[in-house]
């Protein structure tokens, strides 16, 4: 039997690994050390077959190829989160004091029948109303966190405009689901919309792997698990509103991914998105009292 060196290395681990591979397919081989190197030896008669087996093994176990680098954060997102919290606090104070002698909650809550009859502004105004301080604090905290993360993908202005619209669409979807009289308030629909957007963005974080892999879907699965964990707790929890927000958030995220592919780094555009968000909220409240 004439032996030939099929592979050699200064380190023994790879040689012994390949030796086990060949043994598994019933090809005799051995590892020998000589002059500070390690050699994988096989019979010349089976060298071609052994080489093919090792080549196949290497290809099947190659590390995941990353085709592009992770996207760098476009914005830290703190400014948008600060304004989000400030708006909720201001409207909360106006509601609790019946400012301007206006019935903020009655005129602004999400009333499913009235929404279906055309009072679309309620899908927005309801996002700013809360039952108590704990309800408000929770939505400010989670909303700011998710909003900051979304902002790092597409910028603060674009992020909060998308979150606001997705939250409003979530309230609309929730109203369509109930049809009959159903009342709801709170920014949680918008919070879970942000979570849905974040889940979609996480899948497409520039990490476009060459083969389908669970790792790519893990962040999205994590956001869905988080929806189940914090979106279904409590006796007064409107589960359908949370789910509706999450669904609309996912759809909004998909729109960004497939139409724009990358974040909106244009600074003037970020201001346009931000001002549009503020204008939309103001318009909704004006219509709530005069519409």
Identify the function of each model-found stretch.
Residues 12-16, 29-46, 58-291:
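A detector for small-residue-rich transmembrane helices and their helix-helix packing motifs
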Residues 18-19, 50-57:
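Short amphipathic alpha-helices in soluble, non-transmembrane regions
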Residues 1-11:
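Short glycine-/aliphatic-rich beta-strand segments at the starts of folded cytosolic domains
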Residues 25:
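Conserved dinucleotide-binding and phosphotransfer motif residues
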């Amino acid at each position: 039997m004439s032996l030939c060196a099929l592979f050699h290395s200064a380190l023994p681990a790879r040689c012994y690994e390949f030796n086990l591979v060949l043994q598994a397919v019933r090809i005799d081989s051995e590892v020998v050390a000589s002059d500070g190197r390690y050699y994988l030896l096989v019979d010349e008669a089976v060298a071609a077959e052994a080489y093919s087996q090792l080549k196949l093994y290497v290809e099947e176990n190659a590390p995941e190829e990353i085709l592009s680098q992770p996207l760098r954060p476009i914005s830290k997102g703190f400014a948008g989160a600060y304004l989000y919290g400030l708006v909720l606090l201001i409207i909360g104070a106006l509601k609790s004091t019946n400012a301007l002698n206006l019935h903020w909650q009655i005129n602004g809550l999400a009333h499913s029948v009235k929404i279906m009859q055309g009072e679309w502004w309620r899908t927005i105004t309801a996002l700013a109303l809360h039952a108590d301080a704990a309800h408000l604090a929770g939505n400010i905290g989670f909303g700011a966190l998710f909003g900051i993360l979304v902002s790092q993908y597409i910028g603060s202005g674009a992020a909060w405009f998308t979150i606001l619209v997705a939250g409003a669409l979530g309230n609309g979807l929730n109203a369509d689901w109930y049809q009959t009289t159903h009342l709801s308030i709170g920014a949680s629909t918008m919070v879970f919309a942000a979570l849905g957007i974040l889940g979609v963005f996480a899948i497409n974080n520039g990490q476009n792997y060459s083969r389908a892999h669970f790792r790519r879907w893990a962040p999205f699965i994590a956001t869905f698990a988080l929806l189940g964990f914090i979106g279904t707790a409590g006796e007064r929890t409107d589960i359908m509103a949370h789910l509706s927000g999450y669904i609309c958030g996912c759809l909004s995220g998909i729109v960004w991914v497939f139409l724009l592919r990358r974040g909106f780094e244009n600074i003037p555009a970020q201001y346009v998105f931000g001002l549009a968000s503020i204008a939309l909220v103001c318009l909704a409240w004006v219509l709530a009292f005069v519409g």
